[in-house]
Structure formats: structure tokens, C-alpha cells
């Protein structure tokens, strides 16, 4: 049904405990001016449905369209009318789908639910780490695992790097390539510059490719140290310890800065069997079963893993 009166009549007949409207922009009412999906229609229809839900103790889920930038399409007022706003997110090149709480009057708004897009449909993911890491039989140069936070949920992600000499023509003109996938390109370029100037790992005049495994998108600075270590490992052709995770923001002076949720991240790494964790100095992390390596500077981090 797409007419409000018919929807209400059906509610009266069925007396549901759960009501899902998909989507609110397609419902219309002859008693309200304007076209379906317009400001007046959406406001009045949503208000009427919310009123009925509260009067009859019905759990109401309103599905709304979103724009290309991910915001709720149509009138923004729809977000203000409801108690909880959940965004269903995902990249078409990745199997991971997220339900992220944007607004929550009854709890935390930084909670995230993880789901896997499979051939048989969407299934819940209790441990999404397997999508974004690879267990290598032998240590491989250019790989490093980090721990990122999706809301308050720690997820381990593998960063892979490849450093190679460009062709002769590119070398003559200094047109070395910098290609990233799943990472913030300007931030990665900054990390490469710091790696060369502060840790003496030469990457200028060489092609550098850095990517996340499984299509994971990482934008937080906490992955800087893992990016630097993976590139340094690839540049030197020396593998990092397979049981190592690295977290920390890299500053322009080469310092390793503290990050939020460090204890929670390392606890997740320990739970999944990692034995060493490289973290910013002063993080004061104590987790049973994992050795914590504190580093204050990038060159110190490079020395600890012996790729200098």
C-alpha cells in the first residue's frame, strides 16, 4: 500500500508489533498538499505514523532514501522526528556492509553492526577480521596488520605495500607513482615523506603501491604506523614478524602520537592470537598474552622490527 489511509486501515486490521515502511518517500496522503516525497507530505505522514506507533506500542521502522553523499534524502526534518537513525553502508567492491547508528536517543550513537554480503544474502558477522587479513604460511615483505575502529568496534585490517623501481623514462623525470587503495591518499603521501626524511627509508624515485586487503576503507590516523612499516618492509625486502600489529599516528617530525581506544584495539589483537603490538610511547597498555612495544619515533619503530 502507498496511501496513508490504506496503511492505517491495515494496521488497524493486523495489529502488528513491528511496522516497517519502505520507503517513507513513496507514501502519500490525499489530505496533505504536495507530491509524495515532498517536505509537507513526508513530515505529516511520518508524524501520523509515529503518533500511531506510540499510541499502540508498535515498533516503527521508517526506511528512507539517501543521497549520493550518504545523507537522508528529502527533508532533513525526518531525522528529527524519529528516535534512532541507522545508516546501511557498503562499497560495491567489498563484501562488508555496516549498519551505523547516526542518532540514538536510547543509547550510544557510535555502535556499528557488521554484515557479509554473500551469494545467499546478507549474514551477520560476529568477527569481520577474516575479511581484511591474510594468514601467510611464511612472512611476506610489505605486509603489516593494524587495528581500526568502526564506531566502538575494533577490526583488524592488513595493509600491503609494494615498492618497485619505475621505468627508465619515469626515473629520468622523477615521475614515480604513488597509488593507494582503501587509504587516504594525501595522508599516505605524507607518511611516505616522513618515512624517508625521518627514518632514512628511501622511496623517492621508486613506485609505491599501498592497499588494504578486502576493500577495507581506512581514514583514521591510527593506521599511519602500519602504513610506514609495510612500505619500509617492502622497500627493504624484509618481512615483519607475522604476529605483529601496529597502531599509531605518525607526525611530520617523525613522532608517534597516541590514539584513542588503544587498549581496546590491542585486546582484540590479543584475542585473535597476535603476540606483539607496537604502540605509541606512553600508551600504558597492559594486555595478557601480548608483548607491547612502545615507540616514540618512527626511526625507533623501524629499528625495533629490524628493517632499517
Question: For each predicted feature, which ranges?
Answer:
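Conserved nucleic-acid-binding Ia/Ib motif block in the N-terminal RecA-like helicase ATPase lobe
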Residues: 1
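Peripheral, non-AAA+ core regions of ATP-driven protein-machinery
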Residues: 4-18, 24-308
